[in-house]
From Swiss-Prot:
GO cellular component: cytosol
Stated name of the protein: Deoxyhypusine synthase
Residue positions binding NAD(+): 105-109, 131-133, 137, 238, 283, 308-309, 342-343
Co-factor requirement: NAD(+)
Pathways per UniProt: Protein modification; eIF5A hypusination
Single GO molecular function: identical protein binding
């Protein structure tokens, strides 16, 4: 190459390969994974995720974000801060951070149900949002079990056998027959109370009633009823519950569910929150319903998304938290986190590093109430 001395590498190649770096910000963390020479310490292992990189680092940041929600939630309020007439509908006292938990139905079908039940049982979250399946699958599990299967099982053969597949989970169709037998008398009673007592049913009131009627401590909604945690399900008819309501409408017509009252309930929970945090597992209606409620307060203070959806198709499910910032659904000064992962892998670990670490503090708070 012209101008290059004999025996020397081309200067342009040297300049390109050996380009000098600018200094990184002094607070930059070094990549460091867990050293198993320390033995098996799961808390230390998960703490090391913060500096591992990729989605492990996002998980570590999600732990920090949820712990920030909990820290603010457990802070005592001033005497004049917890009186808002609009919040009396849910019968829940205001805390330093109102935590919204959203999850799709498949997670209740899976063993994540037990993780969610733990949070609700111990009054660790304030508002639940799910789909019809996220309600009915919890109740059905109190009547009959769901089984492990394989993703590869053929739909035609399963249908001929009366077996429904949810990923690698199997639900015998007899479970839904048992659900119908249990639900129909409750729907009859709801219609009676509507007609004779003027009860105005909403999806959240119906779910609370079902939680009371199931009377089983394995149920998420048993504990939601006991702890006055509202459960919002704007798509409550989109599932087996809807099927049963449809069949019941022929036998005993007239049941009315008011979604507008529930809309006011969730929006006021956000509006009057001192701070708000969103933990959203999956996407679709549960993700947007919580985010849109937080628009009413110019955005959530904290947000954690866990899902595998991508943003390239413009879907709400795949949208990153920064898109919600543009809509005013997450605050501009927030530090939201999205973990690109299957929630069945990640969420129990997240709870282990956050809520479960503060179990005694939550019990103490409940005893004070």
């Amino acid at each position: 190459m012209e101008g290059t001395p004999p025996g020397a590498a081309p200067s342009s190649a040297l300049a390109a390969v050996l380009k000098h770096s600018s200094a990184l910000p002094p607070e930059s963390a070094q990549v460091q994974g867990y050293d198993f020479n320390r033995g098996v310490d799961y808390h230390a292992l998960l703490d090391a995720y913060r500096t591992t990189g990729f989605q492990a680092t996002n998980f570590g940041r999600a732990v920090q974000q949820v712990n920030a929600m909990i820290e603010k939630k457990l802070e005592p309020l001033a005497v004049d801060e917890d009186h808002h007439a609009d919040l009396t509908q849910s019968r829940r006292p205001l805390t330093g951070c109102t935590i919204f938990l959203g999850y799709t139905s498949n997670l209740i079908s899976s063993g994540i149900r037990e993780t969610i039940r733990y949070l609700v049982q111990h009054n660790m979250v304030d508002v639940l949002v799910t789909t019809a399946g996220g309600v009915e699958e919890d109740l059905i599990k109190c009547l009959a079990p769901t089984y492990l299967g394989e993703f590869s099982l053929r739909g035609k053969e399963l249908r001929e056998s009366g077996i429904n597949r949810i990923g690698n989970l199997l639900v015998p169709n007899d479970n839904y027959c048992k659900f119908e037998d249990w639900l129909m008398p409750i729907l009859d009673q709801m219609v009676l109370e509507q007609n004779t007592e003027g009860v105005k049913w909403t999806p959240s009131k119906m779910i609370s009633r079902l939680g009371k009627e199931i009377n089983n401590p394995d149920s998420v909604y048993y504990w939601a009823h006991k702890n006055h945690i509202p459960v919002l399900s704007p798509a409550l008819t989109d599932g087996s519950l809807g099927d049963m309501i449809f069949f019941h409408s022929y036998k005993n017509p007239g049941l009315v569910l008011d979604i507008v009252e529930d809309l006011r309930l969730i929006n006021t929970q956000a509006i009057f929150a001192k701070r708000s945090g969103m933990i959203i597992l999956g996407g679709g209606v549960v993700k947007h319903h919580i985010a849109n409620a937080n628009l009413m307060r110019n955005g959530a203070d904290y947000a954690v998304y866990i899902n595998t959806a991508q943003e390239f198709d413009g879907s709400d499910s795949g949208a990153r938290p920064d898109e919600a910032v543009s809509w005013g659904k997450i605050r501009m000064d927030a530090q939201p986190v999205k973990v690109y992962a299957d929630a069945s892998l990640v969420f129990p670990l997240l709870v282990a590093e956050t809520f479960a670490q503060k179990a005694d503090a939550f019990r103490a708070e409940k005893n004070e109430d």
